[in-house]
């Protein structure tokens, strides 16, 4: 398809949270809901920040209680909006990637290892387009106290898998040796 979940800077919902500056972090809990975000964080920590904390794979929601002292945590999604109110420091991975590479970032894309019919791709693309054309209605009918969803869905995230995002995705995958 022609769609993804991407950002061209601040993602707002994919962040490393801590009570101390980066260089003082000793341990990092890794969110269990996104392999892409985990791999992005590992790369940024090693290649850009030059920090090598102990990495702990979170297995459930309880890990957020451990984000204190020199223990940090990668938190994604709605939980990241909650965590913003609790943590002293947060580092947005979309922002960091953009600073390092100058490229957008693709957190998720719909892929298939089998050929898809052109009818399916058209229906899929049409369904995505319907959703994008109704963001205002979606936001209005789902109040959310923690963050401005209109801003989130229209400024922080973007959804078209254009050439620049394909380039960014291929670059990220090459860094992972996949």
Model-predicted regions and their roles:
Residues 1-178:
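Domain-level signature for soluble enzymes in the chorismate/prephenate branch of the shikimate pathway
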């Amino acid at each position: 398809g022609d769609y993804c979940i991407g950002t061209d800077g601040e993602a707002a919902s994919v962040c490393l949270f801590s009570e101390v500056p980066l260089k003082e972090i000793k341990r990092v809990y890794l969110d269990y809901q996104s392999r892409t975000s985990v791999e992005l964080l590992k790369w940024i920590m090693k290649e850009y920040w030059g920090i090598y904390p102990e990495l702990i794979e979170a297995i459930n929601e309880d890990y957020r209680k451990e984000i204190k002292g020199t223990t940090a945590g990668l938190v994604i999604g709605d939980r990241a909006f909650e965590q913003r109110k609790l943590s002293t420091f947060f580092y947005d991975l979309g922002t960091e990637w953009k600073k390092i590479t100058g490229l957008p970032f693709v957190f998720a894309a719909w892929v298939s290892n089998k050929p898809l019919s052109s009818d399916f791709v058209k229906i899929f693309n049409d369904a995505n387009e319907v959703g994008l054309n109704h963001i205002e209605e979606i936001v209005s009918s789902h109040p959310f106290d923690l963050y401005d969803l209109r801003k989130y869905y229209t400024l922080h995230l973007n959804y078209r898998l254009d050439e620049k995002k394909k380039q960014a995705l291929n670059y990220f995958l090459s860094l992972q040796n996949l």
